[in-house]
UniProtKB/Swiss-Prot annotation:
Location in the cell: Cell inner membrane
Family affiliation: Belongs to the bacterial AtpI family.
Bilayer topology annotation: Multi-pass membrane protein
Entry superkingdom: Bacteria
Annotated protein name in UniProt: ATP synthase protein I
Amino acid sequence: MVAALARPGRELARQLLMIQSGAVIFVAAGMAVAINPDWGFSALIGGGIFVVANAVFALCAFMFSGARAAKRIAASFYTGEVLKILITVALFYVAYMYMQVELVPLKLTYLLVLGINICAPVLFINNKK
C-alpha cells in the first residue's frame, strides 16, 4: 500500500525524464546536422548534465512514501536536491576542464531542458474528475 502511494509521482518523474532525454537527443542531432558535430556533442553534454542530475533527484525524492515516513520523505527530498546541485556543478566542471565543448550549445541545451522541467508538468495535469 505504501509503495502504491508513490507510484503516480514516480511515473510522472519517469515521463518527464523521457521527455527531457528525447528533447536532448533531438536538439543534439539537429545541431550536429545543421551546424557541426562539435555543436551536437556539446548540446548532448549540456542536456545530459541536466537529465542525469534530475534523475538522481527523482530517485531520492520518491524513495519513501506514506504518512509514517514524513521525516524520511522530507530528508530524501532535501538530499536529492543537494545531490542534484552537487552533480550539476561537478559535471559542468568536468565538461569545462576536461572536454572540448562549445559553450553556446552546452548552455542552450541545458537551459532548454530546464525550461522543459519547468513547463512540462502542466501537460500532465488531469482535471477530469
